Amino acid sequence: MKQAIESFIQSKKVSVNSQKSYTYDLQQFVTVTKGEISQQSLLVYQQSLLDLKPAAQKRKMSAVNQFLYFLYENNLLDRFYKLQTTSGPASVKKKLEREDLTLLFQESPWLEGQLIALLIAYLGLTPSEIAELTSQQVNLDFQVLTVEKGGAKRVLTLPKELIPYMESHLSGRYVFDKKGQTYSRQWFFNRLTEFVQSIGKPDWTAQKLREQYILKQIDEGKSLDQIAKQLGLKTSMSLEKFR
């Protein structure tokens, strides 16, 4: 894959700075997908962009789509893959409708995926934030959860409904612990996918569940600036579509 990236960069007649930007974005893409290109790995990559500003997301997706086309055009892929973006006001409006989240609490054998879904929908956490969440950051007595990101801390109230689901996950270093290490993005994606499919909601991606959290906060009367702060965002710019 490294050689393919180099060949792709050489085919682009762009400045040195642009070459560096392409290289950085594509190396990051390969790291997240582990060099495996499939519809599932592309979804995992797209979920990893959730924390970025819209402009950065657009740039990275453009670079990856150009690279994917290059691979297909040079017979390095047997089909053309493409990262999909939401297009048109109608599809945006559809995505912003409130859903019945009580389905997340129904009994399920997919307990790990269930807790991941609950943390996203009720606390607005991203899969990457959940992956780094340690047991010490959870205080069930005071019903709070502390998230550390980029040197900043934010303390979130843990809904009492989530406490029973958290209790069995606090014995290791991480809430989702792999012998003292964190699991991969692919693991979180797979666990969430298993769970939402089991409750008949295969379209409830991490992004959609996070949107449900935002919509709930709006219904409770909070401003976009307040919600941005709760989500750990520096500005509310990426939340403009919720106005």
Swiss-Prot record:
CDD domains the UniProt entry points to: INT_StrepXerD_C_like
Annotated active site: K149, R210
Chain ranges of the Core-binding (CB) domain: 1-72
A single BP term in Gene Ontology: DNA transposition
Domain Tyr recombinase: 91-243
Compartments, as annotated in UniProt: Cytoplasm
Recorded family membership: Belongs to the 'phage' integrase family. XerD-like subfamily.
Protein name: Tyrosine recombinase XerD-like
UniProt keyword terms in alphabetical order: Cytoplasm, DNA integration, DNA recombination, DNA-binding
Biological role stated in the UniProt entry: Putative tyrosine recombinase. Not involved in the cutting and rejoining of the recombining DNA molecules on dif(SL) site.
HAMAP family: Recomb_XerD_like
Superkingdom, taxonomy of origin: Bacteria
GO MF terms, alphabetically ordered: DNA binding; tyrosine-based site-specific recombinase activity
Stored InterPro entries: CB (IPR044068), DNA_brk_join_enz (IPR011010), Integrase-like_cat_sf (IPR013762), Integrase_catalytic (IPR002104), Integrase_recombinase_N (IPR010998), Tyrosine_recombinase_XerD-like (IPR020876)
Gene Ontology cellular component list: cytoplasm
Primary localisation category: cytoplasm
Entries under Pfam families matching the protein: Phage_integrase
Ranges in a coiled coil: none
Keyword Cytoplasm: yes
NCBIfam families in UniProt: PRK02436.1
